[in-house]
Amino acid sequence: MSRAPDRIAACFDALRHSGRKALIPFITAGDPSLEATVPVMHALVRAGANIIELGVPFSDPMADGPTIQRSSERALGRGAGLAYVIEAVQEFRREDATTPVVLMGYLNPIEIHGTRRFAETAVAAGIDGVLLVDLPPEEADETRAIFTEVGLALIALASPTTGEARLDMLCSTAQGYLYYVSFSGVTGAADRLDTHAASDRLRQLRARAGAPVVAGFGIKDAASAAAMAVDADGVVVGSALVAALADASDVRSARKRAEDFLQPLRQALDAG
């Protein structure tokens, strides 16, 4: 099987050359509706998204706070499993061949699917990377090897409590980008970000990692996005966007909410 194009590397290269930071929104596939997922993805790109993280709904999302847990439950109730997520990316790719798409989720659905079969299916659909929050880096070699064979990036997570030995491993094996969790806890839980502590860590990581470093968890608005982006290659915004989309009444409303939410963040990043 041929390797996938490296859209993630091309994206960060273009951003670096233009002096801009990556804006990476997270949405749960299948929420606020099955029909809204792909239109919302396109709306986010129009509003300035550089990469899209698409959450794979899971019944026990232990790393996620209440907002994304509820979103995942709603999506599962509509039948949004892994097969639906892959089909959504296929549909997205009919109009957008360049914006990277990264799946974020848990190991169980992929193991049920079969890791190699999943990797090949994902690449064929146009998926660029996968972030598995419950896959310890010490146990990731086999999965990484399968993904690497087909050109699928295994995105890694680092946090303020990550030990030095594990951090060395993450930095040396980073693919696509390294996702720095800016505080310890579940998604959406931070009322106020400690940007000074996060900035110190981000500078260290960028000096050590063999891939771009992005910051996420707790970024809620334009101000927090701009603050975190100073020492990162990009920022991820998830829970606040998921909350903004949650009760959209139809596809048109979901598209508008996505654009209205993301545009100020894009403007803040570009102004910084």
From Swiss-Prot:
Residues at the catalytic site: 53 (proton acceptor), 64 (proton acceptor)
Gene3D superfamilies: Aldolase class I
GO molecular function (one): tryptophan synthase activity
GO biological process, one term: L-tryptophan biosynthetic process
Alphabetized UniProt keyword annotations: Amino-acid biosynthesis, Aromatic amino acid biosynthesis, Lyase, Tryptophan biosynthesis
The organism's place on the tree of life at top rank: Bacteria
InterPro entries per the UniProt record, alphabetical: Aldolase_TIM (IPR013785), RibuloseP-bd_barrel (IPR011060), Trp_synthase_alpha_AS (IPR018204), Trp_synthase_suA (IPR002028)
Pathway(s) annotated for this protein in UniProt: Amino-acid biosynthesis; L-tryptophan biosynthesis; L-tryptophan from chorismate: step 5/5
Keyword Lyase: yes
Disulfide bond entries: none
UniProt GO cellular component terms: cytosol
Catalysed reaction equations from the record: (1S,2R)-1-C-(indol-3-yl)glycerol 3-phosphate + L-serine = D-glyceraldehyde 3-phosphate + L-tryptophan + H2O
CDD domains: Tryptophan_synthase_alpha
EC number: 4.2.1.20
PROSITE patterns with a match to the protein in the record: TRP_SYNTHASE_ALPHA (PS00167)
HAMAP family given in the database record: Trp_synth_alpha
Quaternary structure annotation from Swiss-Prot or TrEMBL: Tetramer of two alpha and two beta chains.
Biological role: The alpha subunit is responsible for the aldol cleavage of indoleglycerol phosphate to indole and glyceraldehyde 3-phosphate.
Family statement drawn from the similarity comment of this UniProt entry: Belongs to the TrpA family.
Protein name: Tryptophan synthase alpha chain
Organism in which the protein naturally occurs: Xanthomonas campestris pv. campestris (strain ATCC 33913 / DSM 3586 / NCPPB 528 / LMG 568 / P 25)
